[in-house]
């Protein structure tokens, strides 16, 4: 994750990664949202979950920290209130907003593979906002690498030793 460069440094490796902070607001009451949506103009994801609705968005590059910026949270709420009729984000839900850190590389591609310096180390990090989506494919590639099989795709663009 976002701490990968700190771990890599202990092994003499340099990974160009930084933490990209995303925010989420979980709405505990009923909402008019029935289907997941991405509000493209504001880049806010709206996801009905079991028992609540999640609003999520932003990509804040501010280092490894969990400081919640109220203006970011309110912007996410405003986006949903603008798109959905009779939609209001209750103040208590706003104050319970959380954030998470996503590992982001300069070119937006994850690092997948073995660095030249360590033949017994396989890296799979830097997936940014696509970690869960890319997890199964990355897992398959890591299994192929670990078992010594040829990988099912060319990993050159994802190589851990690439430089920017």
Q: What is the role of each PLM region?
A:
Residues 1-119:
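Active-site substrate-recognition segment that forms the wall
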Residues 114-164:
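C-terminal lid/capping helical subdomain adjacent to the catalytic/cofactor pocket in oxidative enzymes
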């Amino acid at each position: 994750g976002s701490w990968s460069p700190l771990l890599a440094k202990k092994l003499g490796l340099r990974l160009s990664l930084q933490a990209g902070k995303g925010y989420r607001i979980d709405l505990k009451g009923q909402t008019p949202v029935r289907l997941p949506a991405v509000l493209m103009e504001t880049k806010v994801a709206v996801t009905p979950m079991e028992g609540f609705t999640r609003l999520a968005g932003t990509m804040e590059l501010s280092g490894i920290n969990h400081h919640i910026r109220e203006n970011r949270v309110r912007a996410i709420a405003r986006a949903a209130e603008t798109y959905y009729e009779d939609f209001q984000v209750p103040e208590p839900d706003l104050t319970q907003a959380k954030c998470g850190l996503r590992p982001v590389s300069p070119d937006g591609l994850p690092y997948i593979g073995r660095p030249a310096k360590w033949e017994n180390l396989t890296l799979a990090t830097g997936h940014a906002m696509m970690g869960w989506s890319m997890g199964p494919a990355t897992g398959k590639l890591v299994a192929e690498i670990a078992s010594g099989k040829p990988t099912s795709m060319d990993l050159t663009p994802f190589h851990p030793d690439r430089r920017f």
